[in-house]
Amino acid sequence: TAALKISETNGKVLRYGENPHQKGFFFGDFDAMFSKLHGKELSYNNLLDVDAAVNLMGEFKNDAPTFAILKHNNACGLAQRETLHQAYIDALAGDPVSAFGGVLISNKEIDKATAEEIHQLFCEVVIAPSYAADALELLKGKKNRIILIQNETEMPEMLVRTCLNGMLLQD
């Protein structure tokens, strides 16, 4: 037996939903999973892409340097190389057009060389476990760019999705 309770009073009001004419809300503990270092408020679409990015990178958490670029919940670039810098370059080469305005995620600390490459691309969100100080300062050069540190947390045990006139739950 499963039970689900959502308290509307704990929802964070977002700028808007998937489209500007829709209302958007987030129910959950974002701050337990991420430390926001810089940038504007996350949007509904940002949150969906961040979720997809975290789920994808979870497959490469303890692997060699890996970089992924996502847009509209889909990976448009993914590479694992000896250096994070090369992983980013190769991930971007996967689909540089779709990468514009996307979410970037790394499984390793972002160094200055990688940050210099990232800084040339318009991206909404950058996620990493940590940032070298000089890399962080460079990435903060775009005032609206959202920079997140992914904290060490467990993903929820249940996947919840709306479906038809109800919900699906899965472990």
Q: Residue spans of the language-model regions?
A:
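Active-site loops and adjacent core secondary-structure elements that bind or stabilize anionic groups
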Residues: 1-138, 142-171
